[in-house]
């Protein structure tokens, strides 16, 4: 006879074999495809969209149903193409209710490599806003009562692709790759947690995590949420954030915290931008720009307000405040940017990023900048205006005499190593790439002042008209020389001291041409005068102190 121990071993083996056979046979005995209509209806009613699944198969070991196709229809007001489509979807279920009660209880959903289409219309409404809309669900009583209680333990998207289309913008759709998303404890009636990551063109990445819900079943875009956003190495142009024509470029990192009640969103964070360029003809800044910002946005009207926002470049700090409004692809600003006593040494190498050029071989050294600029209009073509004031700075390395041409012979101007500017103030207006400068006041240490107006064209052509006046010791030296000059030359110098010398500045910012207006000095005469016509072929008598006079006038005319 068989011993008791051996009997139990034999029975266990037999039972194990039977169980194994059943486990293997169940997927064949259970036609999972029979559950496809029921699951499609459940998901369609949950989303408010038509959900279509391909052939369903069942895996007992993974406890999941696998469909070889998935399609979720879009809101017909936006597109007839699918909102979501994927080659495969895994639906985790509770095995026992499925086998014994023929009941489907969904525990998880995993969508592999889906293509998701996000569309925004001209009224700033998104195609996902109608997701979960109760008015679009099935009218069956049993479905209506069960849908609010639908919950999914885990909803995942793996290796997705999201295409973002703005119907109000002329720009092509933006495509975001490698989208990974996970929602835990998803329910239409209770809060849930989520995380998301994706890649931008140009090696940029974004990760978002937070909490959402309860789900707004009338408008999904108004579902309350919190979010922690981290963006790394976002290429502003290559990533499609700004069009190339805007002239803005750079690489940005962003960290932000968002809190939304479904009506308004409060955002607080930082931006660090490298290689930043803010003008079409600008060049990348060599150092990073750091921004601290706080903003509140109305999600319905897409209006917002900037508060407690600062922009720092080195030790230079700008305060930014104002409002904005987005309509379609256009965002309009009404903001100010101000600074008080910002060190010019920290701003000098940022000027090329703004498209501002210094004369070739020169640079600003020392001093401070004070300004309060208004920034209005569309973000891709803003109008910037307001007062600008520089104090106690030096334009080093600018050879003035070489720019003065024939006038240098008259005033005796000689090359200088720099121009010490006590004050430079003006009212600036920049629009369309061109600059208007009004009410210019320039005070050069020990030389004099210059006042006037001018413009810089989008091609950087200069057209300035100023009046230069001697003052202090320079004026005294010139006055003593007048007594030794007779005739036309003496009258010219006397007029220059009394009324100022009209000066025209043309050329370009990198190569300006500075020309005293001799015709203006003589009251219109028969034509422009030059050094030869004023002084004769032999010039001034040898006893006239031309060196002192020339240096005095030349310094004022050139160094401004």
Region annotations inferred by a language model:
Residues 514-560:
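Gram-negative outer-membrane assembly/targeting C-terminal domains
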Residues 49-54, 421:
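A short, amphipathic edge element
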Residues 89:
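An amphipathic, basic-hydrophobic helix/alpha-beta surface used to engage anionic
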Residues 133-148, 524-525:
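Intrinsic-disorder/low-complexity linker and hinge segments
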Residues 41, 59, 63-85, 105-129, ...:
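Small-residue helix/turn framework positions
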Residues 1-48:
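N-terminal type II signal-anchor transmembrane helix
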């Amino acid at each position: 006879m068989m011993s008791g121990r051996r009997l139990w071993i034999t029975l266990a083996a037999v039972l194990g074999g039977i169980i194994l056979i059943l486990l293997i046979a169940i997927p064949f005995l259970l036609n999972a495809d029979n559950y496809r209509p029921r699951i499609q209806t459940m998901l369609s009613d949950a989303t408010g969209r038509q959900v279509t699944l391909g052939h369903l198969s069942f895996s007992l070991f993974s406890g999941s149903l696998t469909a070889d196709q998935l399609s979720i229809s879009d809101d017909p007001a936006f597109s007839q193409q699918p909102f979501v489509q994927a080659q495969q979807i895994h639906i985790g279920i509770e095995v026992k209710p499925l086998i014994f009660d023929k009941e489907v209880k969904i525990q998880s959903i995993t969508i592999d490599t889906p293509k998701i289409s996000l569309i925004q219309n001209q009224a700033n409404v998104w195609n996902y806003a109608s997701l979960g809309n109760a008015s679009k669900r099935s009218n069956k009583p049993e479905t209506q009562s069960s849908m609010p209680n639908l919950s999914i333990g885990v909803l995942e998207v793996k290796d997705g692709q999201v295409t973002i289309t703005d119907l109000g913008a002329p720009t092509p759709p933006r495509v975001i790759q490698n989208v990974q998303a996970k929602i835990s404890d998803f329910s239409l009636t209770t809060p849930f947690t989520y995380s998301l990551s994706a890649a931008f063109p140009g090696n940029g990445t974004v990760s978002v995590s937070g909490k959402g819900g309860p789900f707004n079943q009338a408008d999904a875009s108004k579902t309350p949420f919190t979010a922690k956003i981290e963006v790394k190495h976002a290429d502003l142009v290559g990533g499609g954030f700004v069009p190339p024509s805007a002239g803005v470029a750079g690489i940005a990192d962003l960290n932000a915290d968002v809190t939304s009640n479904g009506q308004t969103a409060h955002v607080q964070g930082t931006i660090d931008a490298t290689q930043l360029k803010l003008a079409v003809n600008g060049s990348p800044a060599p150092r990073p720009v750091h921004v601290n910002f706080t903003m509140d946005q109305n999600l319905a009207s897409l209006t917002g307000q900037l508060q407690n926002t600062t922009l720092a470049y080195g030790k230079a700090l700008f305060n930014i405040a104002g409002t904005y409004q987005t309509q379609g692809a256009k965002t309009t600003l009404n903001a100010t940017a101000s600074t008080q006593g910002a060190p010019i040494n920290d701003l000098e190498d940022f000027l090329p990023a703004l498209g501002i050029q210094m004369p070739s071989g020169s640079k600003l050294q020392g001093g401070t900048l004070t300004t309060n600029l208004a920034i209005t209009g569309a973000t891709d073509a803003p109008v910037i205006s307001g007062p600008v004031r520089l104090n106690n700075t030096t334009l080093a390395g600018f050879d003035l005499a070489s720019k003065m041409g024939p006038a240098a012979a008259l005033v005796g101007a000689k090359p200088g190593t720099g121009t010490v500017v006590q004050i430079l103030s003006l009212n600036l207006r920049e629009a369309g790439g061109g600059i208007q400068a009004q009410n210019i006041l320039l005070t050069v240490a020990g030389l004099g002042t210059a006042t006037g107006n001018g413009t810089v064209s989008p091609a950087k052509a200069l057209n300035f008209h100023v009046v230069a006046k001697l003052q202090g010791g320079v004026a005294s030296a010139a006055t003593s020389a007048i007594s030794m000059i007779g005739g036309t030359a003496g009258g010219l110098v006397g007029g220059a001291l009394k009324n100022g010398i009209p000066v025209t500045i043309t050329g370009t910012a990198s190569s300006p041409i500075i020309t005293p207006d001799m015709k203006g000095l003589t009251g219109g005469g028969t034509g422009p005068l030059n050094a030869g016509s004023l002084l004769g072929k032999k010039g001034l008598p040898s006893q006239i102190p031309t060196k002192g006079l020339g240096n005095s006038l030349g310094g004022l005319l050139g160094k401004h």
